[in-house]
Amino acid sequence: MKVLILIIASVLLIGVECKDGYPMNSEGCKISCVIGNTFCDTECKMLKASSGYCWTLGLACYCEGLPENVEVWDSATNKCGGK
């Protein structure tokens, strides 16, 4: 019983840090998509995300549950198109 409590306490204290966002290609642009989630889900899972889908309004892949070390697109630090 003590071991179970120790494991639960450890998980709660350590926590699993995850983030959501738009993954970027090598040029710093969002990964484009048009319809369907299969492509984006595959791209996101290659980055160790829990899932991904095509956000149709933005025509870009959106990943959920990305590790903290994966860079995601941010309008403040946008480098896409030489900006």
UniProtKB/Swiss-Prot annotation:
- Similarity field: Belongs to the long (4 C-C) scorpion toxin superfamily. Sodium channel inhibitor family. Beta subfamily.
The alphabetical list of record keywords is:
Amidation, Disulfide bond, Ion channel impairing toxin, Neurotoxin, Secreted, Signal, Toxin, Voltage-gated sodium channel impairing toxin
- All copies of domain LCN-type CS-alpha/beta, residue ranges: 19-81
Disulphides: 29-80, 33-54, 40-61, 44-63
Provide the GO MF annotations for this entry: sodium channel inhibitor activity; toxin activity
What superkingdom heads the lineage?
Answer: Eukaryota
* Glycine amide sites (modified residues): 81
Q: What is the lineage of its organism?
A: Eukaryota, Metazoa, Ecdysozoa, Arthropoda, Chelicerata
Q: Where is the signal peptide?
A: 1-18
Q: Name the organs or tissues of expression.
A: Expressed by the venom gland.
Q: What does this protein do?
A: Beta toxins bind voltage-independently at site-4 of sodium channels (Nav) and shift the voltage of activation toward more negative potentials thereby affecting sodium channel activation and promoting spontaneous and repetitive firing. Is possibly toxic to mice, freshwater shrimp and crickets.
Q: Which residues form the propeptide?
A: 82
Q: Which Gene3D superfamilies match?
A: Knottin, scorpion toxin-like
GO (cellular component) term, any one? extracellular region
Q: What is its main location?
A: secreted
Identify the SMART domains for this entry. Knot1
The record's InterPro entries line, in alphabetical order, gives: LCN-type_CS_alpha_beta_dom, Scorpion_toxin-like, Scorpion_toxin-like_sf, Scorpion_toxinL, Scorpion_toxinL/defensin
* Domain characteristics, as noted in the entry: Has the structural arrangement of an alpha-helix connected to antiparallel beta-sheets by disulfide bonds (CS-alpha/beta).
Record has Signal as a keyword: yes
Its recorded name reads Beta-toxin Ct7
Protein's UniProt keywords contain Signal: yes
* Listed GO biological process terms: defense response
Report the locations given in the UniProt record.
Secreted
